[in-house]
Structures are given as structure tokens and as C-alpha cells.
Swiss-Prot record:
Protein's UniProt name: D-amino acid dehydrogenase
Localisation: Cell inner membrane
Family as reported in the entry's similarity comment: Belongs to the DadA oxidoreductase family.
Main location: membrane
Annotated residues for binding of FAD: 9-14
Described function: Catalyzes the oxidative deamination of D-amino acids. Has broad substrate specificity; is mostly active on D-proline, and to a lesser extent, on several other D-amino acids such as D-alanine, D-phenylalanine and D-serine. Mediates electron transport from D-proline to coenzyme Q1 in vitro, and is involved in the electron transport chain from D-proline to the c-type cytochrome in vivo.
Gene (UniProt): dadA
A Pfam cross-reference name: DAO
Domain of life: Bacteria
Amino acid sequence: MKKEVVVIGGGIVGLSCAYSMHKLGHKVCVIEKSDGTNGTSFGNAGLISAFKKAPLSCPGVVLDTLKLMLKNQAPLKFHFGLNLKLYQWILKFMTSANAKSTHRTIALFERYGWLSIDMYHQMLKDGMDFWYKEDGLLMIYTLEESFEKKLKTCDNSGAYKILNVKETKEYMPIANDNICGSVLLTENAHVDPGEVVRSLQQYLQNAGVEFLYNEEVIDFEFKNNLIEGVITHKEKIQAETIILATGANPTLIKKTKNDFLMMGAKGYSITFKMPEELKPKTSSLFADIFMAMTPRRDTVRITSKLELNTNNALIDKEQIANMKKNLAAFTQPFEMKDAIEWCGFRPLTPNDIPYLGYDKRYKNLIHATGLGWLGITFGPAIGKIIANLSQDGANEKNADIMLFSAFFRD
């Protein structure tokens, strides 16, 4: 069976690649090992948080993380063991936590954040129906030191709105007096990620994009400097262009003789119902404990914690209890009605820079992975970049790849 473009992976990045490739007139086939109704793209916070917000690795983060570890509030939990890549990842994370690297990354976040916003607008214009709100990201601070530090970065551009405790409670009615204040980053947005994924699926299927669900790619067939065949557990598929967007699963990446400095970071979320008057008025992030709380059409979702160096796909009840405990320290008591707990793995690089671009060996293979906790933020932008790259034909001809790919970042 021969295809023009095969996208391996049906998450937000894979679907965004399929969307932009289809827009260029290509015949696209998406291969997804699951039934396409659940996955990391469904369970995340839904933040489009590219603006005026530092990456995970930034100055001071190492010391701050160690302090939070002592209180069991750290955003990262490391399962230490005999895994050399974990220590390589940590070393890169630490060396990336400098002012120069952070300044560059923030600038890139802004550039590709606006591209993602444009792509979300295009999706809505195309008739897709999903929860989408451009009403900012409320950064709530629980430590006076970090609040003062954030205030020093605010300017009069309109991108920031500084709120005291009383004003913060108007946005976050359940907040208690243990908070210090907040800053509304007005340019950010949020979506219901599940609605985005389902809308993309429906749009693409109606447009003639082929979907092979419950079909797992298990290997590749190579010939010289090309991938001659994509081998699934059902068939062999040939393709002119193959886009590998399999998220945190490194199996197929390793089949292509690559071993990216990327870890599967296990994240958690709880989705629940609460009275409308108690819901946060916009997407919010308790910045000092790295916990997001996002309003949706009928529910609210909290997300937190990233565990590194674990393959356990089961929900850790201790982590869920810890999330609730950390949130309770800064909120009034409230009921999480009809709560749904979730966990999933994100492809996290140590500096928040994804792996994008043509493979160094196989000329018809394009990589699109490594967005970590920023999949919803940058997924649509990545789809556009990858589609443009397919026209350019080489990494070096595409400025966005040269700027935003880990292949070209020290």
C-alpha cells in the first residue's frame, strides 16, 4: 500500500501536521496505535501559555526545585536509578537554567505562540467547534519573594495586569488569604484539549484524510537513505514522506538510530464539576507549586506534577492526594464533584526545545516531538512549520527549524 504522506501519531502534534499538510494539498494518512479517544493530548491543562512566561529551565529553578522537594511541592519528581539518560537530562536542564538561554527561549515562545494562535483562529474559521478563550493566564503567587520577582518583569505594554489578593479572588473565588497576589498575562489563552483533538479528527476525516486507528507501527524497512516501508502489525505501508510524532514513546525513534535527550514525563490531572460561581474566571497557574487550574465548558481541570524516569502507567494515588493537599493550602474548602483522575506521559526535553526537522540519515523522515507540557501551546504552530519544511526540502532552508529545533540548539 502506497501513501503520499504518513503521519505516525494521532495526538495534537500529529493531527496538526496532518491538518497543515492537507492544507497544502497533500494526501495524508494518520496511523495511531490507540482508538484515538484518549491520550496525553486529552488529559492536559489546555493552556496556550507562550507569552511572558519563563520555560521550565530558567535561572533559580534548581534551588527553587530543591526547596519545594523538601515540602513535597516540587513540579518535578525524579525516580533516581541506573539510567544514564536521566542524569544527562538533569545536567542539560541545569546548564540551560541561565539568563541567556532563558531570554532566547522566551523570544521563541512568543514567536511561535502567535503562530499557534493564528492556527487556532484558522481552525475555528474552518468550522471546528471547541472551547477556546483568549482571556489570559492568571499567575497566582504564594511566596512573596517570587511575586516580587515577577513584578519586576512587568511593564506597561498591556501584557500584564497586576492584582492584589482581593482582586485575585475575583478571578479565583476559592483562593484563600495564603496567596500574595497575582499577575494576569493577558496575551495567553486556553482550550479544552479534548474538544480540539476531536474537532481536528472530525474535520480531517470529513476532508478525506485517512485514519488507521488501532494500528501500531512496529518497525521500518530501510533502503539506502530512505525509509522504504512503515511496518505495522497488520501491513506494510510505503510513503513519500513520513512524519514521526509519537510523543513520549521513544521506541520508533530508536528504530531510526536516534536517541534524543528527551524523557517521558508522567503528568497528572483531575477533572471535576463545581458550582459556576466558584469556577476560576480564566486559566490559572499557582506558580510556586506549578499547579494549573483551568475552567472548561462544564468542568474544571487541575494539572500538576511531572515524574521523570518511570514507566508506570498507573495512577499513583499518593500523587493525586499530594496535588489535592498542595492546592488546599491556598484555597477555601470545596468539593470536586464527579472527579475523573488521569495520568499520561509527555515528551519532555531539558530546555523545552522540541526535536523538529528532517532526519540526518533518512531523507523522507521528518521528526516532530519533544514539546513536553507545551503540546497544546505549540502543536498547531509545529504542524505549520513541518508542512512548510516539507516544501523547503531541507532543514537548512527553513528558518523556523533552525531557530526552534533541538537539532540546532546547543
